[in-house]
Amino acid sequence: MLSPKRTRFRKQHRGRMKGISYRGNHISFGKYALQALEPAWITSRQIEAGRRAMTRNARRGGKIWVRIFPDKPVTVRPAETRMGSGKGSPEYWVAVVKPGRILYEMGGVTENIARKAISIASSKMPIRTQFIISA
């Protein structure tokens, strides 16, 4: 699972996901990519599940690039705890994804293999996505 080695602060505010992604919205490594169409928090487990699905489907050959990284800690309070007494402890990590952001890239395989692998990875994602090809 992906997570930062160390962070400056243990806990973060939730923030909000306004607008579209202006960074990381162009294919820069491979030839095919999976692009987000909705804003969401994508957990490190979901990123890993998508990556595994793609590698398993592409078999040998081909290279995969994961273009998002979970750098936001999500805190969770224990069950049946009264209100107050501070913020919960960090439980898992998420990547904040805005519409237009490239999630995965793929190269070194034919288009139909890439399309199949990326469609399986997209089913692991909690958002609507689209398959794009670099111009």
From Swiss-Prot:
InterPro entries (alphabetical): Ribosomal_uL16, Ribosomal_uL16_bact-type, Ribosomal_uL16_CS, Ribosomal_uL16_dom, Ribosomal_uL16_sf
One protein family per Pfam: Ribosomal_L16
GO MF annotation list: rRNA binding; structural constituent of ribosome
Subcellular location: Plastid, Chloroplast
Chief subcellular location: plastid
Entry keyword set: Chloroplast, Plastid, Ribonucleoprotein, Ribosomal protein
Biological process terms in GO annotation: mitochondrial translation
CC annotations in GO: chloroplast; mitochondrial large ribosomal subunit
Taxonomy, superkingdom: Eukaryota
Oligomeric and partner information: Part of the 50S ribosomal subunit.
PANTHER family named among the record's database cross-references: 50S/60S RIBOSOMAL PROTEIN L16 (PTHR12220), LARGE RIBOSOMAL SUBUNIT PROTEIN UL16M (PTHR12220:SF13)
Family: Belongs to the universal ribosomal protein uL16 family.
Protein known as: Large ribosomal subunit protein uL16c
Gene: rpl16
